[in-house]
């Protein structure tokens, strides 16, 4: 046997056969073992070669496999198994016959199909094939059909057997079986593809467009037209096969294997009796595929000769970027294809596409998708999912919304789940109490049984209602699925000219089922209307199976973080009271708070310009008046976290070249792939507050970059990607003109007089360019803080200290007397420095003494710290005597109320 030249797969088949014989304890290797090894060939793609041949010969492949396994089990076995398995006379004869066949066919090696071809010369295998319904003549024809005209001239020649079935997907067959989604629109692109395919030379179109615009669907639309005979005569009998480049490359371990596979595919295409059009999705994968860097040819070079001779009809599909990167570099390959540009459809076209796909998604998810949901999906995808393309983004929205409704519907309703949990707990309690003998347990047992009966009585109607709604929904879902199948059968019958079946389905089966679906939908609508009319607790439907605009809004909000959901009552109240919420944190700046609140309300009410940021502000004023604090308060209001904002400190962008840190380094520079600090954060969180702190510190070139952000709500990164900023609030802070605001030039209500305001504005105009200022929504000048404002800020700061103690797990309450608050406000008031000195005063006069008292044991957990005024100074009262460790000798009087003035002088 060692003298026979086997291919790699044939040698592995014999090795597997020996292993099978050894595992069953058989002393000899019989043809049954070889057949079993061929049926369990783990290296084959999909079905095994033997199973494919049996099926092609008209036999029952599954029955043949069962017969081989049954015969294998009945062979005599040894225990313990023999150390060495010998070749039976029947197997030796089978190998000799295979060797003779190899010589007859002038092959260089014995392959798997040689083994299979001589199965009919073995009595045992011949009888098994006969049981499976295979005749010797049909079997021989099937073997030759799989082999084709190929010659076994290499050890891996079997890779090319039945290559089209292994490495391609028949799109025309999928379309015939109704397994492809309908293609709506794209008529111009499909017609252009047909025209290119009908050319005499260069009849290979390549579909180029952005990801998600529907390039693959054009090929599917062409497959649909071919089976509907809606193409010219030269394409009417064609098969459209999609080439799987991944399967071609996968498993090609040695040099030459990949080339062998693709040559087999091309040869089968060329020799096929039916004209074949090859569709290559992601065509750029052909460039370099299979070369392996060892001098091997890539797939593109193997395709070139057939493309040049016009013997191969090929449709390619790739993106603009990948076409430029890979295909344009190979001019010889590029010129053999004719470009067809696939543009992104409009919103109206996308809605039409969604309407065409609606039925497929309804059947798949078992839900009803409203037309308003489709319109909402198209508009929201276009507006908010700017990094993706229609119609793919809109289809994904509808798909996920339908999936969310389906998951909710197939889960048990919360009210029913809670009742059943309660009932289970009561039953467990009853079983435990039944073992007890005391009077208290007996009383509790009686009460538990009564409560269990009440819960069971309450659960029963809800469960019945749930089961009724579920069965009604299931029946409707099954009817829609059945209708989809009948429509596919009717179309197939028309194509096969089976007009009797087509007429039965078209005029009897389908109309009857449509009437049934209409009746079920009517019953459901009637039940829902009755529930709404009754408006009693528990009368509303338990199961929701309709996808509406609200469900689409929720998916968009989940994906982007942008609150596009319908305004709820609680949120409406929050937005209407926004000034009150912000004013509690930002004291004395009513004008700024009102401007910010109005911008957010405009956006959530849908009245803001969709082509600009939500709002852009320039906050000007003295240091410490609350410019940055208002930004934090806004972020806290919108996202419940004051740190949930994009903060750019412009003092870090004082050089010209630092603009690359903002938007990313240009191509060729170090850090190009990393992206910019602004653009990358904005891509991840499109709905955010962007703070440019101390804007006047930045270089003028950096401010120039912000012009497009303020005007069109977009910014182009260093990588050429357009980043959307239309859902961001842009806030810039500046101290320009602060020197005019430090003097006492304001009215009693804290507002700045017109003269001072004009002086500040002149200072701003003198620094910033007109085109920059002209793009800002509102310039807000912050007032100088008054003493009454400082008094209110004291209370806020004390509350912050209280929260800090709680976060550090200190249960100490702080009580500050009104006199102490007034004294702290007086000591912390500074017109030039705003509220920041107050923080230092509170730290020196309240927090430092408290820290000493806590460490000294004079102030303990779950106690109150009393802050009062004694002898004109702030004093924190101790609650206990000092520990006898000398700590009480610290001089508290050394901390006086002049510390603020000393620090600022």
Curated annotation (Swiss-Prot):
A GO molecular function held by the record: ATP-dependent protein disaggregase activity
Annotated ATP 1 binding sites: 209-216
List the residue ranges of the region (Repeat 2): 87-149
Q: Which residues bind ATP 2?
A: 621-628
Q: Please list the residue ranges annotated as the Clp R domain.
A: 2-149
Q: Region (Disordered): which ranges?
A: 441-460, 880-905
- What are the subcellular locations of this protein? Cytoplasm; Nucleus
Q: Does the keyword Chaperone apply?
A: yes
- Show the InterPro entries listed in the entry: AAA+_ATPase (IPR003593), ATPase_AAA_core (IPR003959), Clp_ATPase_C (IPR019489), Clp_N_dom_sf (IPR036628), Clp_R_dom (IPR004176), ClpA/B (IPR001270), ClpA/B_CS1 (IPR018368), ClpA/B_CS2 (IPR028299)
Keywords per UniProt? ATP-binding, Chaperone, Coiled coil, Cytoplasm, Nucleotide-binding, Nucleus, Repeat, Stress response
Q: Which SMART domains match?
A: AAA, ClpB_D2-small
Q: Which residues form a coiled coil?
A: 410-533
GO CC terms for this protein? Answer: cytoplasm; cytosol; nuclear envelope; nucleolar peripheral inclusion body; nucleus; protein aggregate center
Q: Which domain of life is it from?
A: Eukaryota
Major localisation: cytoplasm
Segments for region (Repeat 1): 6-75
Which family is it part of? Belongs to the ClpA/ClpB family.
Assembly: Homohexamer, forming a ring with a central pore.
Task: Supply the domain comment.
Answer: Has 2 AAA ATPase type nucleotide-binding domains (NBDs) per monomer. ATP binding to NBD1 triggers binding of polypeptides and stimulates ATP hydrolysis at NBD2. Nucleotide binding to NBD2 is crucial for oligomerization.
Q: What does this protein do?
A: Required, in concert with Hsp40 and Hsp70 and small Hsps, for the dissociation, resolubilization and refolding of aggregates of damaged proteins after heat or other environmental stresses. Extracts proteins from aggregates by unfolding and threading them in an ATP-dependent process through the axial channel of the protein hexamer, after which they can be refolded by components of the Hsp70/Hsp40 chaperone system.
> What protein name applies here?
Heat shock protein 104
Organism, as annotated: Schizosaccharomyces pombe (strain 972 / ATCC 24843) (Fission yeast)
């Amino acid at each position: 046997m060692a003298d026979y030249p086997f291919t790699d797969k044939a040698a592995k088949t014999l090795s597997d056969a020996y292993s099978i014989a050894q595992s069953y304890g058989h002393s000899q290797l019989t043809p049954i073992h070889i057949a079993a090894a061929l049926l369990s060939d783990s290296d084959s793609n999909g079905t095994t070669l033997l199973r494919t041949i049996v099926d092609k010969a008209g036999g029952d492949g599954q029955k043949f496999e069962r017969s081989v396994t049954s015969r294998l089990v009945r062979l005599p076995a040894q225990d313990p198994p023999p150390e060495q398995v010998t070749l039976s006379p029947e197997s030796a004869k089978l190998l000799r016959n295979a060797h003779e066949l190899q010589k007859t066919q002038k092959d260089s090696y014995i392959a798997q199909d040689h083994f299979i071809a001589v199965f009919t010369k073995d009595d045992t295998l011949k009888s098994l094939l006969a049981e499976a319904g295979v005749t010797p003549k049909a079997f021989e024809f099937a073997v030759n059909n799989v082999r084709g005209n190929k010659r076994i001239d290499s050890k891996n020649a079997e890779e090319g057997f039945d290559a089209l079935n292994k490495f391609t997907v028949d799109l025309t067959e999928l379309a015939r079986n109704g397994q492809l989604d309908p293609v709506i629109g794209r008529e111009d692109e499909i017609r252009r593809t047909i025209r290119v395919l009908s050319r005499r030379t260069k009849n290979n179109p390549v579909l180029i467009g952005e990801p998600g615009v529907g390039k693959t669907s054009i090929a599917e639309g062409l497959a649909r037209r071919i089976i509907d005979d809606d193409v010219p005569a030269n394409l009417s009998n064609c098969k459209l096969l999609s080439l799987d480049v991944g399967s071609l490359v996968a498993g090609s371990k040695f040099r030459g294997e990949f080339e062998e596979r693709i040559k087999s595919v091309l040869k089968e295409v060329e020799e096929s009796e039916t004209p074949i059009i090859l569709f290559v999705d992601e065509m750029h994968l052909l460039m370099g595929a299979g070369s392996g860097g060892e001098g091997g040819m890539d797939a593109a070079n193997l395709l070139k000769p057939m493309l040049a001779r016009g013997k191969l009809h090929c449709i390619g599909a790739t993106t603009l970027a990948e076409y430029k990167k890979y295909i344009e570099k190979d001019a010889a390959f590029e010129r053999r294809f004719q470009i067809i540009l696939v543009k992104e459809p409009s919103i109206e076209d996308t809605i039409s596409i969604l309407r065409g796909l609606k039925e497929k998604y309804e059947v798949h998810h078992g839900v009803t998708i409203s037309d308003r949901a489709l319109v909402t999906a198209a508009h929201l995808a276009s507006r908010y999912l700017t990094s993706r393309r229609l119609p793919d983004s809109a289809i994904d929205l509808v798909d996920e919304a339908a999936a969310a409704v389906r998951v909710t519907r197939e889960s048990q309703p919360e009210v029913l789940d809670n009742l059943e949990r309660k009932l289970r707990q009561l039953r467990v309690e009853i079983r435990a109490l039944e073992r007890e003998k005391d009077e208290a347990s007996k009383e509790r047992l009686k009460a538990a049984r009564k409560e269990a009966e009440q819960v069971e009585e309450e659960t029963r109607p809800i469960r019945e209602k749930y089961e009724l709604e579920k069965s009604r929904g299931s029946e409707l879902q099954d009817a829609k699925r059945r209708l989809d199948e009948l429509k596919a059968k009717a179309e197939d019958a028309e194509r096969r000219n089976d007009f009797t079946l087509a007429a039965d389905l078209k005029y009897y089966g389908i109309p009857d089922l449509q009437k049934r679906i209409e009746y079920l939908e009517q019953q459901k609508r009637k039940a829902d209307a009755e529930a709404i009319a009754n408006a009693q607790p528990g009368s509303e439907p338990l199961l929701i199976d309709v996808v509406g605009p609200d469900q689409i809004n929720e998916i968009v909000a989940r994906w982007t973080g942008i609150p596009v959901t319908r305004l709820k009552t609680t949120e409406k109240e929050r937005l209407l009271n926004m000034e009150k919420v912000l004013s509690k944190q930002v004291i004395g700046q009513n004008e700024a708070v009102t401007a910010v609140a109005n911008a957010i309300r405009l956006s959530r009410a849908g009245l803001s310009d969709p082509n600009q940021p939500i709002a852009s502000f320039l906050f000007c004023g003295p240091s410490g008046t609350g410019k940055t604090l208002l930004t934090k308060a806004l972020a806290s209001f919108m996202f419940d976290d004051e740190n949930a904002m994009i903060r750019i400190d412009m003092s870090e962008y004082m050089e010209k070249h630092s603009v690359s840190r903002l938007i990313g380094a240009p191509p060729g520079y170090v850090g190009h792939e990393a992206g910019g600090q602004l653009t990358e954060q904005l891509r991840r969180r499109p709905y955010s507050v962007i703070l440019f702190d101390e804007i006047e510190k930045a270089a003028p070139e950096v401010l120039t970059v912000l012009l497009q952000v303020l005007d069109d709500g977009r910014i182009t990164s260093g990588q050429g990607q357009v980043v959307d900023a239309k859902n961001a609030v842009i806030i810039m802070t500046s101290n320009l003109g602060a020197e005019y605001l430090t003097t006492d030039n304001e009215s009693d209500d804290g507002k700045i007089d017109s003269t001072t305001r004009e002086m500040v504005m002149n200072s701003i105009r003198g620094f910033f360019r007109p085109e920059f200022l002209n793009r800002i929504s509102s310039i807000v000048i912050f007032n100088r803080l008054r003493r009454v404002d400082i008094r209110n800020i004291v209370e806020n700061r004390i509350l912050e200290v209280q929260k800090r103690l709680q976060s550090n797990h200190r249960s100490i309450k702080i009580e500050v007397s009104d006199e102490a608050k007034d004294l702290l406000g007086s000591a912390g008031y500074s017109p030039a420095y705003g509220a920041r000195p107050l923080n230092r005063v509170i730290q020196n006069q309240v927090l430092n003494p408290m820290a000493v008292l806590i460490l000294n044991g004079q102030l303990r957990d779950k106690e109150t710290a009393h802050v009062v005024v004694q002898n004109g100074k702030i004093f924190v009262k101790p609650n206990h005597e000092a520990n006898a460790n000398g700590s009480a000798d610290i001089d508290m009087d050394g901390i006086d109320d002049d510390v603020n003035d000393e620090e600022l002088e």
